[in-house]
């Protein structure tokens, strides 16, 4: 039996996007967001612009049926507070709040998988920022502290593994995850 058949749907999704995820992680690591305040402010600016686009994701009606505290998971206000703590202006950026309004459930679930999965990296970065820049959940690193809260959350993987999805919906799930990563790379290229 091929190994791929032994993987859960969430594990297959993770494997399907692993190359682009690794590429983003390596690029962010090379930018050294915890090395100094200027690098960290650029990182927060990137997160802010990306989170602006995600507002509609946290309002998607179908996701609310399955994901507890979905509204609480948005971190845009925390990034605003962090940038304010650091006396850094908010970027002038157009919002795209309706991107997810009529999107297919499997597609937005793929996006959410990427966003929530990024919390593992953010939690690690939060520890580095606290150690190297002396920022924390009270000043300058609220966003990263909140990410740490959800980094061990298995609810989403459980949902992905147990939903009844046809082949097309499974492909749409992967497409959503890939689009989320490509969109992040787009903003990363613009801001760095």
Predicted region positions:
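Metal- and O2-centered redox machinery and metal/ROS homeostasis
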Residues: 1-192
